[in-house]
Amino acid sequence: MYGIVNKAIQDLITENFGADKWEAIKEKSDIDVDFFLSNEPYDDAITYSLAIAASDVLGITLGQVLNALGEWWILKTGKEKYAGLMEAGGNNLKEFLVNLPLFHNRIMLMYPKLTPPEFKVSHIEESSIHVHYHSKREGLQEFVRCL
């Protein structure tokens, strides 16, 4: 995953739990990286290690860590880094979800080594929409659920 994901984990932890918790998470995960470069790809194992260590250090489930990261991704990372792209996705949530594949195509221009998940929509109705998620990466469903 790109460093922007690991940086989002760091920012989430630091802002909500403090720098000491972040240092404890880095130590527990055996990650020897002082800072993450947003545009650099990192081994997925680093991201998973950080999430697992956050679960242990914070005393919450891995699912709760990933839920919090999903919320953070939209409310903080998305707004700060991709506001223009997100606004171009549509005038409402339904339009954005329908246009999500186009959003990832645009993101891939910024992150050429990105392996994005695949989203498809079906059963589009006035008050509901079914979103189907597929990824080569295992275990990120809770992250996606809270986006």
Question: Where do the protein language model's features map onto the residues?
Answer:
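A generic structural signal for short
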Residues: 10-11, 39-40, 136-137
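Extended Gly/Ser/Thr-rich low-complexity repeat segments
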Residues: 143-147
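A short, structure-level motif marking secondary-structure boundaries and short turns
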Residues: 6-7, 35-37, 131-134
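Electropositive phosphate-/nucleotide-binding environments in soluble metabolic enzymes
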Residues: 3, 7, 15, 19, ...
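Charged, compositionally biased N-terminal leader segments and the immediate start
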Residues: 1-33
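Alpha-helix N-cap/helix-initiation sites
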Residues: 2, 19-22, 40, 44, ...
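Long amphipathic alpha-helical segments
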Residues: 20-22, 26-57
